[in-house]
Regions:
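Conserved glycine-rich Rossmann-like NAD(P)H-binding loop of the short-chain dehydrogenase/reductase
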Residues: 29-46
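The beta1-alpha1 cofactor-binding region of Rossmann-like NAD(H)/NADP(H)-dependent oxidoreductases
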Residues: 40-41, 60-73
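A glycine-rich helix->loop->beta "capping" turn
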Residues: 5, 53-56, 76-89
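Flexible cofactor-recognition loop at the NAD(P)H-binding site
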Residues: 16, 86-93
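Aromatic pocket-lining residues of Rossmann-like dinucleotide-binding sites
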Residues: 26
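NAD(P)H-binding Rossmann-fold N-terminus in SDR/SDR-like oxidoreductases
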Residues: 17, 21
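Conserved glycine-rich cofactor-binding loop
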Residues: 8, 15-16
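Flexible N-terminal pre-Rossmann segment of NAD(P)-dependent oxidoreductases
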Residues: 1-10
Length: 93
């Protein structure tokens, strides 16, 4: 089933744990994912792995405790995909 086909999904805390599992599931269902995480290294590694497998993903640094980071996440997502269809807040602050 491709419930997320051509949907742009922004996931915070996306590079490990539940966020990573959610990222993988949405990609497997055709979603385009912005991997937003405070660990740039893990986010980049996951994005590279998924892109190598053919997924349409991007990664960006994100910290829920920094207002500027929140603004930059939205700007980044809009610049890359021109829209956000789904936002999954998977991080605490």
């Amino acid at each position: 089933m491709n419930r997320f086909e051509n949907k742009v999904v922004v996931i915070t805390g996306a590079a490990s744990g539940i966020g990573e599992a959610t990222t993988r599931r949405i990609v497997s269902e055709g979603g385009k994912v912005v991997i937003a995480d405070h660990s740039e290294k893990r986010a980049e590694q996951l994005a590279n792995e998924l892109m190598h497998a053919g997924a349409d993903v991007r990664h960006v640094y994100f910290s829920a405790t920094e207002l500027q980071s929140c603004k930059e996440l939205i700007d980044f997502s809009m610049n890359e995909y021109q829209r956000i269809d789904v936002l999954i807040n998977n991080v605490g602050g």
